[in-house]
Design a protein with these regions (language model features):
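Active-site pocket-shaping loop/turn-to-helix segments
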Residues: 1, 22-48, 92-102, 106, ...
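Conserved beta-strand-centric core segments of catalytic alpha/beta enzyme folds
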Residues: 1-3, 100-139
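Acidic, glycine-rich active-site loops and adjacent beta-strand->loop/helix elements
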Residues: 9, 22-29, 62-67, 88-91, ...
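Short glycine/threonine-rich loop-to-helix capping motif typified by GTGT followed
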Residues: 31-38, 63-81, 95-99, 131-138
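Conserved catalytic cysteine-centered active-site region
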Residues: 75-102, 107, 112-117
């Protein structure tokens, strides 16, 4: 599960935040080549934040087909040892309406396990659109 609230509300409830949202981006491609959406979404969020692909410690790239991740990696140059390290949607499933939550939980758990700082989640959302989110693990 993912629980989202302000830092103020977390303090009020005596809860310790595990991560914060660093940035969001949305991008689209020609619907005919819709499986390429994560590529411009990733480029857009990195440009927006000033981070480089090498600044990201863990990637969760949702895929319905293996070619999505391979095309994404070829274009971004991401280190594949940091991509879907616990298995992607092909191995673990692609839950309808819950992919984002699954990816976010996996991403944060892996950042905590490895001591990483930044995690990037990127996924297609249909019709050529894709979204990207960078989270920052808090100590």
């Amino acid at each position: 599960a993912v629980l989202i609230m302000s830092a103020e509300k977390a303090a009020e409830l005596g809860m310790k935040p595990r991560a914060k949202f660093h940035s969001f981006a949305l991008a689209g491609t020609d619907p005919v080549t819709m499986l390429k959406g994560p590529i411009p979404a990733t480029k857009k969020i990195l440009e927006k934040t000033g981070l480089s692909i090498d600044d990201i410690d863990v990637f969760e790239v949702n895929e319905a087909f293996a070619s999505v991740v391979l095309a994404w990696q070829k274009e971004t140059g991401a280190d594949m040892s940091k991509v879907n390290v616990n298995g992607g949607a092909i191995a673990l499933g692609h839950p309808l309406g819950a992919s984002g939550t699954k990816l976010m939980a996996t991403l944060l758990n892996e950042l905590e396990r490895t001591g990483g700082k930044y995690g990037l989640q990127v996924m297609c959302e249909g019709g050529g659109m894709a979204n990207a989110t960078i989270i920052e693990r808090l100590d």
